[in-house]
């Protein structure tokens, strides 16, 4: 029998080690459980999340040059396998569009996820 603590540990550590791609985009539709990609991806970064208890925290910085002139209004966490043709989306959030960011300015996005096995 796998006890609760072991299940929690496996879930948190699996997600932390596999879901390391943060993508931003400029879509704004509601997120559906069947959704597999951002509405309109703009940029992505590889980020290993911090683990605090059962909480995972991804922090990704993007410059205005990364974001482009359209701004961004959605963020997703993805698993990318080297042999996969498509990424697997774990979670997606939408927010008010950032608008244009100066090329040399940096925007920091933080995504927190509570994992309960």
Task: Describe every region a protein language model picked out.
Residues 1-73, 80-117:
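Small cysteine-rich, disulfide-bonded extracellular modules of the LU/uPAR three-finger superfamily
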